[in-house]
Regions:
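C-type cytochrome heme c attachment motif
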Residues: 14, 18-19, 85
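Ferredoxin-type iron-sulfur electron-transfer modules in oxidoreductases and energy-metabolism complexes
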Residues: 1-10, 14, 22-55, 179-180
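Residues forming the flavin
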Residues: 36-244
Length: 244
């Protein structure tokens, strides 16, 4: 049921483990670790073979966006026998997986390994094509039998607070892609670089943690992280025995 357990096994916060009823009495099932270990053992044993369809349907499909949703859709449609092309405006396929998730959380060769399998199955990739600019929707509709929109959310949430307009304040998705490109050797001096600077991160979730790790690796002088929620306890609270 999961096309890419090697991605989710590394990146998913595993709410299923928090909700696992086994956790009432003992430690919950380590679903995330089981998933990751299984797929890595399979890749290591070279048994993750491409699933090439027995016959083609003759239908052509364009998938716009090469993040996890677009790649999953493309793989399923290719395996069903359709001819699928994935369009991505960035120079490399992967979307948020490649340019949003830091290298220290998931190495990019993990993505490339899966893309190689998808290419063997028949999926075609069209990086560096900005749909709506380089090619119109009408052109795609005339070329393909169906189009899947998997462009993701490109509008971030902002904080309308005094001083927001000041210099040196960035959104996470302005900062992280440049950090990824620097780690990959695509740029030497990214336009947003916190080396030697004092950094304040607003937000204590996964994205905030990614910004923290990237800032430390760029050589920030200090990093302070602010979170609106209280610090969670080390153990399950006595008044909350049931998993959530």
């Amino acid at each position: 049921t999961n096309n890419f357990p090697e991605f989710t096994g590394r990146l998913c916060p595993a709410p299923c483990e928090t909700a696992c009823v086994v956790g009432i009495n003992v430690d919950p099932v380590t679903i995330k670790q089981v998933e990751l270990r299984t797929i890595e053992e399979a890749f290591g044993a070279n048994i993750v073979a491409p699933q090439i369809p027995d016959r083609l349907t003759g239908k052509t499909i364009a998938v716009i966006g090469s993040g996890p949703a677009g790649l999953a859709a493309a793989q399923q449609l290719t395996r069903a026998g359709h001819t699928v092309a994935v369009y991505e405006r960035a120079e490399k396929i992967g979307g948020l997986l490649r340019y949003g998730i830091p290298e220290f959380k998931m190495e990019k060769n993990i993505i490339d390994r899966r893309l190689a399998q998808m290419e063997q199955e028949g999926t075609r990739f069209r990086p560096g094509v900005n749909v709506g600019v380089d090619i119109t929707g009408s052109q795609l509709r005339s070329k393909y039998d169906a189009i899947v929109l998997a462009v993701g959310a490109t509008q971030w949430r902002d904080l309308p607070v005094p001083g927001r307009e000041l210099k040196g304040i960035y959104q996470a998705m302005e900062f992280l892609p440049w950090g990824n490109k620097q780690a990959l050797g695509e740029v030497e001096n990214p336009p947003i670089n916190v080396a030697g600077k004092h950094v304040v991160i607003l937000g204590g979730g996964d994205t905030g943690a990614d910004c923290l790790g990237t800032s430390v690796r760029q050589g920030a002088a200090s990093v302070t992280q602010l979170e609106i929620m209280p610090r969670p306890t080390e153990e399950r609270p006595s008044g909350q025995p049931w998993p959530t």
